[in-house]
Design a protein with these regions (language model features):
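Metallo-beta-lactamase
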Residues: 86-142
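Active-site environment of divalent metal-dependent phosphoester hydrolases
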Residues: 9-11, 31, 65-70, 91-94, ...
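Active-site-proximal beta-strand elements of phosphoester/diester hydrolases
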Residues: 3-6, 22-25, 118-125, 144-151
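Active-site neighborhood of phospho(di)ester-bond hydrolases with catalytic His/Asp-centered motifs
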Residues: 24-25, 57-70, 85-88, 146-151, ...
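Active-site-proximal loop/helix segments of hydrolase catalytic cores
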Residues: 125-175
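N-terminal pre-catalytic "stem/leader" segment of glycosyltransferase-like enzymes
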Residues: 1-16
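Pre-active-site segment of Zn-dependent metallo-hydrolases
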Residues: 20-61, 73-74, 153-164
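Active-site HxH/HxHxD metal-binding segment of metal-dependent hydrolases
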Residues: 46-110
Length: 175
């Protein structure tokens, strides 16, 4: 069973995928700043779900290190009992901010099993591009969610890795 609920008009989601029940990229409080406040600060156009009103969930998935995905002020308001799975750059940021929290690193191009789901993280090939990760979330029936909130171009190796799965849901931007 797959259930998807949008938590804001950016990239925060609540996903139920078989036995997996998790929140992706929660930015639910205040503004987000990319770089310098005077250069690029963004606010929600529509009020997001309040932290205290989040649906039940077992863990968090943080896909990017950017503040609209890895929002420290929101994460400070979420119970530290909730484990976090994070891509490499987000993991480094989170480990500095929350040294005692249960945070699992999702290594690039490796299958990581967690709560009856498998996670594969892809990073782009181009060295000069910003690092925008994609995460594939697979259930025990080889059905998958492909989450690439900034878009993503698969290389041949990554494409061959996901060909064995049936992608049921694509969450991405189309800009």
């Amino acid at each position: 069973m797959l259930s998807v609920k949008r938590l804001n008009l950016d990239s925060s989601w609540h996903i139920k995928f078989d036995s997996g029940n998790f929140i992706i990229d929660p930015w639910l409080i205040g503004s987000e700043i990319d770089g310098f406040k005077w250069l690029n600060q963004q606010w929600h156009i529509k009020e997001p779900v309040k932290v205290e009103n989040l649906p039940s969930y077992d863990f968090l998935l943080i896909s990017q290190n950017y503040e609209d995905h890895c929002h420290i002020n929101t994460l400070k308001e979420i119970s530290e009992d909730k484990p976090i799975l994070a891509t490499e750059k987000a993991f480094k940021k989170l480990r500095k901010e929350f040294p005692k929290r249960n945070i699992t690193l999702l290594n690039d191009n490796k299958e990581i099993k967690y709560n009856d789901l498998t996670f594969i993280t892809f990073r782009p090939d181009k060295v000069l591009d910003p690092i925008y990760y994609a995460v594939v979330i697979i259930n025990k029936n080889n059905e998958a969610i492909f989450y690439a909130p900034h878009g993503f171009v698969l290389n041949d190796s990554q494409l061959s890795m996901i060909k064995k799965f049936s992608v049921s849901l694509l969450i991405t931007t189309f800009t």
